[in-house]
Amino acid sequence: MNESTMNTKNSEQAILNSEYYETQEISHEIKTVNASVQSSILKDTNTYLTEATFNLPDYLAQRREKVEAALESSITSGYPEKLYKSMRYSLMAGGKRLRPILCLASCELSGGVLEMAMPTACALEMLHTMSLMHDDLPALDNDDYRRGKLTNHKVYGENIAILAGDALLPYAFEYIVVQTKGVPADRLLRVIGQLSHAVGAAGLAGGQVADLESEKLQNIDLATLNFIHSHKTGALLEACVVSGALLVGANDEVLWRLSRYARNVGLAFQIIDDVLDVIATKEQLGKTPGKDEKAQKATYPSLLGINESRYQAQKLIEEAKKELAPFEEKAIPLISLADYIITRTH
């Protein structure tokens, strides 16, 4: 094994085994978010013009359209028909498609093109959808609505919803392997390893268990809450960002910076989710608000208050953006997506 291979393996292991959320000293001076970032995406989405204004709504709409088209063809019909219908029902229920868009953006930042990352982007949405289907079940959050529609188990029953989620999990990995073209096998293995880690006991599943065990406890502190959400929410979001760069064969420096960016963004995302659960309407959220308070769950607003929660989210976003400084204008989409996360209303 040569020195380069050893360094790559050591770096990969360090990312997977490091403490998922690092306590960071964050400056109390919060920079004003620049609403107009200089750049524009041409039809060749790998090219940017610094003299024009980057339009995030247009960027999101274009990317979402591409992701929707890819997802539409990712799962067709089959037997048992009810299983496939259940899988498609939740996968094609809409949503922001933020996770696949983050994957595509990090791939482009690292020098890749959309086509090489689209199968992984779709797989990430499959994994996210699986987690929502299971999270909505009566045994967990017991939600009736998701993305403005009845949850899967309300339409197909709990048994089918569980099995459809189970089916989406391995299919996501199969889809990466079968559909990705022009990417070396060793890179695909690293991507699959990253995604497996993100949804397993060291990631999403572990965070979910910690969340369940913390319900109705009165002594939940901020460190515990950070642990729960850096795993339950942040692990998969980190995989979205890092996997896009892995497909291109990005070096250790790029991977580490993107990992730190994603960890900060992931926690900020959850803080804003908690805030919106308090202040947003059912129509805005597409699901029932106020569920956390009714379940007596510890949340960022319950520990910090609304204003301090927003402040902490803003600080995390500023730290995330600092990690992207060396990439200059290539990082504009990821910077803008970070700002979007704390200004969204649903």
UniProtKB/Swiss-Prot annotation:
Any one annotated GO CC term: cytoplasm
Domain of life: Bacteria
Note on cofactor: Binds 2 Mg(2+) ions per subunit.
Catalysed reaction equations from the record: isopentenyl diphosphate + dimethylallyl diphosphate = (2E)-geranyl diphosphate + diphosphate
Binding site for Mg(2+) 1: D135, D141
PANTHER family the UniProt entry points to: FARNESYL DIPHOSPHATE SYNTHASE
Identification of the protein by name: Dimethylallyltranstransferase
Organism in which the protein naturally occurs: Fischerella ambigua (strain UTEX 1903)
Source taxonomy: Bacteria, Bacillati, Cyanobacteriota, Cyanophyceae, Nostocales
